[in-house]
Amino acid sequence: MTVTDPEKLEFIHGLTKDVPHGRRSFFDHLLKTAGVMEKLCKDISINKSRYLIDAALFHSIYGTSYFKHRSDVTREKVTLIIGEKAETLVEFYCNLPDRQIQILQHKFKPDQLQRDLYMLEYANVVEQSVDDVQSTGALNPAKIFMMRLIRANLMDHYNLKMPPLPFNFPSK
């Protein structure tokens, strides 16, 4: 990742470097998710993307219904580091029960929030899938479905010209 402020990286690294996340560190997952988001924003020409990249870097810092990370970091401190818009998105994302289902229901207003949640979840699932392929050589069918569905929703609801998924799927 090229555009992340060293202060943000140092802060998130200090909070997450020793926290496991599957086969690797939580920090590794957060950093690579931000990298996926950065590339996605560039590929679909989202110019004001800093808050999305920062939100991806911190996307599970408060823990989620899927990842039970807890730290003593405050919303105020995170807001100082990544800004109010990114932190508000992170806090909302972290506190959504059954997050993937709720995001896929396309029920959040304003439309910008819904789009940002789709993008954050997409970056998260793509990053985890890349790690799965690198570690095991296989893709989880549920993640394939999730990536395809979110990608389709971003194209259909927001007219975004999404890049192809970074995987080759066998045709049936």
Language model features: what each stretch is:
Residues 1-172:
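Metal-dependent phosphohydrolase cores
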